[in-house]
Amino acid sequence: LKMAESQGADQAYIALSRTGATPTPDNFNADFSGQASWYGGKFHGRRTSNGDVFNQDGFTAAHRTLPFGTKLLVMNRRTGDSCVVQVNDRGPFSGDRIIDLSRGAAQKLNMISSGVATVDVMVLENQK
């Protein structure tokens, strides 16, 4: 497995690719794909569903069913930008979106201005 490092605002995450290569839109082995949105602002400083204090600049995500603590590699299909997030909240609860990302993750994925992006998601570490 080759390690691809993704720098965050406060921390660096190490992502392990199943393909042995740095993930790109052409070789990304996604567990699921779909529309992602992001949230921040009024939620910053509030408690998430698992009790964490939400940091809009962090690298976290809301997912409807994945266990809290699950680490995901998320890639913006259009740009190829990727980052690792950890599930600490529930959602999204609107439309056909599959994941809601913190503002920090959305910024890393270059999806702030669009608000939504088509993403591919790989489960790196699933908490039981």
Where in this protein do the model-derived segments appear?
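Secreted/periplasmic proteins
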Residues: 1-128
